[in-house]
Structure formats: structure tokens, C-alpha cells
Amino acid sequence: HILEHSVLCGSDKFPLKDPFVELVKGSLNTFLNAMTYPDKTVYPVASCNDKDFHNLMDVYMDAVLHPNIYKEEKIFRQEGWHYELESKDAPLIYNGVVYNEMKGAYSSPESILDSVTQKTLFPDTCYGKDSGGDPVYIPELSYEKFLDFHKTYYHPSNSYIYLYGNMDMEEKLAFLDEHYLSHFDYLDVDSVIQEQKAFGACQDVTLEYPVAENEGEEDNTYLSYNMVVGNAADSQMAMAFEVLDYALLSAPGAPLKQALIDAGIGKDIMGGFDNSPLQPIFSVVAKNANKE
């Protein structure tokens, strides 16, 4: 997550402090973003103007492959974490864009529940780690480990590049090869994700989360039941669970949702089918419930 932010803080060809902001303000983009997932980081751009699209592609490729992070440690400190002293009498605190962003995320019980679910279901794979960053552990990341991660994984050999739309595909591929891909030798990157081995029995986990002072514990419990189901490559199974998700939980008058509410299990029922991990998850979550 810190790398996702940091590579967009200037590069060899575009040594601006924040080229991403300049593109947001000055380009004709129809989509411009970057997203971190447990198993990948995505840098998507889109534009209806061919020249603009070409420029966006150039800026993003240079950002990902030739970022200024090797020249300026302050990028890591700004986007990741650093010590800060607001005054000589103030306590020394942590600060940083991603650090503060994730502190905000971890103030949400839904975010905490999602993180705990992933850790419990996938303790031995990357899905059990919070790719956004747990604010408790973010300050343990050193600048050297940060750079090592980029050197290891931010390489064309460990990437997929997708081009889609009405364009001269040969021209775009030739540009990518001439200006970027041909400058790298093949690298054997070990980024294969192994499947989590099944547990011998259902795992029961009970954890606490903070509530506001003006809230009590009554009707503030979350009850979550989660199952790993098959493999994401099984499209027929995925379709079946999408239908089950809609029929049981999402459709108007969905029977499972209504039955749980009628039984007083929770005042709201969430959940569904998540096909984004290698091993998909089907979840049923009762919100505003009680321990009993």
C-alpha cells in the first residue's frame, strides 16, 4: 500500500512531486487510480483521447518501474510513516499518509472484522496479511525493506499489462517495448500463491473492538460465519455461489437474511460471495447482534 502511493510521487522522466495530482487536474482521463489487493497492486488508466491515453500510459509505466523512491527517502517517510513532534512539549507521534489512512480504516468495526476473517481463514498465505497495512505494524517497516520489495516484485517479469479499446495495438506494444520492457532482463520472481490447507475443524474466534463512549455493548456485537469454497478458477462454481448469494442474502425478502432477522440473531444481515481471493469465501454476518 505504501509502495502504491510512493511510486506515484515522481519518477525518472516525470520528476514532479505529485504527478498523479497533476494528471487528475490536467489530463482528459476517464479513469485514473491505483489499488492495493492482498495478491496484486493495480495501476489502471483510461482516456477517450488517444494522445492523452498514450501520455497516461507513459507516466504510469515510468512511475511503476522507475520511481524516485531510490533517490528520495522522504517519499517513503511522507507516504509511509515518520516521527513527528508538533511542539517541544508535545509527545512524539507517528505520522504518514498510509499510516493515518489505515488508522481511520481500523476505527471501523467492519474493517476490523474483515481483517480478522482473512487472518483466520488464511493464516499461511498472503491473504492472511492486511495489504493495506496494520497501523500497529506499519512503523516496523524500514526504508531498506521497502526498497527491497520494489526491487523484487516491481519487475516486468512479475506483471501483466492489459490494453483494451479502440487503439493501434501494435503501436502501443512497440512503445512499451522500446521505452520500458526491452530495458529489463528476465527475472524469475517467486510470487506463486499456495492454497491454504484445510483445517481439521471449524475455527472459533472471539475478539473485542472499541465502541464509542456514548454506545453500550448491547446490540453492538458482530457474528460472522465464513467458509472457504473451492478455487477462483472454477467459473461454474463461482456462478453457482453468485446465484446463492443473491437468492439467500441479497434479493428482496431473501429467506436466509429474513430468517436470521426474525430469529433475533441480528438487526441486519450482511455477507455474500467474495471471488477475489485464490480461494473464494462465502460469508454470513449478523450486525447489531448480542453475544447471547
Report residues per predicted region.
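Charge-rich, well-structured scaffold segments of protease-associated domains
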Residues: 6-200, 206, 214-234, 240, ...
